[in-house]
Amino acid sequence: MGQKVHPIGIRLGVVKRHNANWYANPKQYAEYLLKDLQVREFLTKNLKNAMVSNILIERPSGAAKVTISTARPGIVIGKKGEDIEKLQRELTNIMGVPAQVSINEIDRPDLDARLVAEAIASQLEKRVMFRRAMKRAVQNTMRAGAKGIKVEVSGRLGGAEIARTEWYREGRVPLHTLRADIDYATMRAETTYGTIGVKVWIFRGEILGGMKQVMNPAPAEERPAKRGRGRGEGQERRGRRGDRAADKGE
């Protein structure tokens, strides 16, 4: 049966960027990748209440730069910048090179798929009805200016004995259009009945920047229309051939 490709993975290099930008020798690649995973786990654990959406890791020569996209920058920075300085020291110890932390504030969290999925998962863990949580997320996202949204939850919904999947969609979510800016995220809600999976697709419009403009083709030169041989003209030619043959016979 058909399966869906990851909406962000298929758009990398088209309208999406990688979450890690660095180059390494083959011997250093595994080491860098492991440290990236440790950094992401550390930040996800320590900034659980900061509404962190994305973590971008860059490695300029002899240093590291970590950009944290969050809807609550005050929690990350702390009072007089104490928390962010502590974060830099911790990340420097993990990565082994001087680390610089920068904050990217998310202006509209309702248009971020990860934050929307986190909100739904949090409500499910607080025993809010799943239909109410899904509809509320859809309404808030569309009100924030999204072109479309799809929300899917799966598991023992409402404490049912048999797991099932339910989804809501509003607007357009064109997964096959590569220039479409689609944000996608998954989250897990740990409820008393078991784990419930949450998936969110948000269509924020089309990105046309950087694409070659299609010029209008030059009009083709007008050629005289071809005339087909008419029925009478053919009979006249055959008549002339017959007259010439008769002259030769004489």
Swiss-Prot record:
GO BP, one annotated term: translation
Source taxon at top rank: Bacteria
HAMAP family: Ribosomal_uS3_B
Listed Basic and acidic residues bias regions: 220-250
Protein name: Small ribosomal subunit protein uS3
Database matches in InterPro entries: KH_dom, KH_dom-like_a/b, KH_dom_type_2, KH_sf_prok-type, Ribosomal_S3_C_sf, Ribosomal_uS3_bac-typ, Ribosomal_uS3_C, Ribosomal_uS3_CS
MF terms (GO), sorted A to Z: mRNA binding; rRNA binding; structural constituent of ribosome
GO CC term, one of those recorded: cytosolic small ribosomal subunit
Family: Belongs to the universal ribosomal protein uS3 family.
Record lineage: Bacteria, Pseudomonadati, Pseudomonadota, Gammaproteobacteria, Moraxellales
SMART domains in the cross-refs: KH (SM00322)
Pfam families: KH_2 (PF07650), Ribosomal_S3_C (PF00189)
Function of the protein: Binds the lower part of the 30S subunit head. Binds mRNA in the 70S ribosome, positioning it for translation.
Complexes and interactors: Part of the 30S ribosomal subunit. Forms a tight complex with proteins S10 and S14.
Sorted UniProt keywords: Ribonucleoprotein, Ribosomal protein, RNA-binding, rRNA-binding
Residue segments, region Disordered: 215-250
KH type-2 domain boundaries: 39-107
